[in-house]
Amino acid sequence: MNKTRTRFAPSPTGYMHIGNLRTALFEFLIAKHEGGDFLLRIEDTDQERKVEGAVDVIYKTLKECGLNWDEGPDIGGDFGPYVQSERLPMYKGYAEDLIKLGGAHYCFCSEEEIEAQRKEAESLGISFKFNDPCKHLSAEEVQAKLDAGEPYVIRQTIKDVGETYFDDEVYGRIEVDGDVLDEQILIKSDGYPTYNFANIIDDHQMQISHVVRGNEYLSSTPKYNLIYDAYGWQRPTYVHVPPVMKDEHHKLSKRNGDASFQDLVAKGYLPDAIMNYIALLGWAPETEQEIYTLDELIKVFNIHRISKSPAIFDIDKLTWMNGVYLRNMDEETYYETVRPYLEKAVHGPYNLKEIAKIIQPRIDILNQIEESVDFFDTLVDYDLEMYRHKKMKTTPEVALKALKASKQTLEAFDQWDSMDALHECLLALPKELEMKNGQVLWPIRTAVSGKQFTPGGAIEIAFILGKDETLRRIQVGIDRLSEIVEDDEEH
């Protein structure tokens, strides 16, 4: 049995968008599930679209995601070079062989001649398919034009194909009328191969067993197969995958400002969570399990569970999954992950490890950290209506009573190095005051944070702030509440 070999063959045109990354992941999983090889090949034949530094982005992204390649431009292998522009002389030779085999021909037509045919088709209301007169030229006529230095492209020759079909692992048997296939360009006038032709040659040369790509290539595959057949080569196994959609009507697209992998990481999503989530875009495991490590995905991945239907990218689902990853981290890994964000957000003399602990159950993405902990450095001029809480049964009057009592208690409290002792101290207060826990703890939390939503409760926040700052903030609350409560009493 031949070894399973897949390839990820991106063009160096910028950032890695989610659809591309999902294709790379599927290719990686197909190969690794079968104990095979995953190759990286750079397809840079379209020199106009090439972006400086984009190859490094590809390397960096794949490494961050754990998609380590077995062969590629940087590490070599038995089938290199792995950059198409470094393989240029080879393609021309293969194209000339294909001409001899009757699968291709020289085309000397000008853009004007092609455009004239297009306009004629439009005027007749029929779909345009270029009917190339050059394929009827004799060998002598072709040679005379070549000797005269006429510019040319090499086109695929398609004739008398009739009904043709191929089998796809996802979409099953695909039948196509050969008469609708157009004679695509294989070698451009600048000598560069087109993406379509270079792909076929490279896949064969590199012994790629499974070609994984977007379902938009289903319609081109019969043309590829004619080339495989003309050379007498074995066709690869085709795995066409559905698109990743922004919504029911729009594909995810970097051009439309949709998030790339780099954008998501910059927003505070974890590479492992992103990979887990995109594995489930268009593929479903046999169980209800949703959280998978890459190694677990390798074990359970099955081509036949790839869906034919488009997958919709749901940022809320990714956010939820990212939160699960953050909460499942061991203490040390988690702290090292959030520390840069905490150092940026908190500059006061506070224990960042303690802050990290209280935010772990409450954040889903790393970029939520700054906003959730900004009150440690600065107590804002908050709305006093926050002291009014129906569920907690608090009003400004109740809050003022609670804050005055808590200030007195905390001034006498001297075990600020123990969260448990502080917990015991503050939870004893409601009983003494014959109040409910929330009637005391909600006002304290409001006073020490100035926020309606905080990553921790009153006791946790007070413990991190320490005695002096906690008492200062409670006094601010007392002073401000005294003004409105007294005003109410006067009226």
Residue ranges and their predicted role:
Residues 419-465, 469:
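Helix-rich, typically C-terminal accessory recognition domains appended to large enzymatic cores
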Residues 17, 27, 58, 98, ...:
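Residue-level signal for inorganic ion chemistry
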Residues 97-100, 105-106, 110-240, 246-252, ...:
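Active-site cores that bind ATP or allylic diphosphates and position pyrophosphate for catalysis
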Residues 1-123, 221-233:
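N-terminal Rossmann-like or analogous alpha/beta NTP/dinucleotide-binding catalytic cores
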Residues 55, 275, 331-339, 403, ...:
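An amphipathic alpha-helix signature
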Residues 390-420:
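Long, amphipathic alpha-helical coiled-coil segments characteristic
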Residues 231-385, 393, 449, 453-491:
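Catalytic adenosine-cofactor/nucleotide-binding cores of aminoacyl-tRNA synthetases and other
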Residues 6-12, 39-44, 206-211, 259, ...:
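Glycine- and acidic
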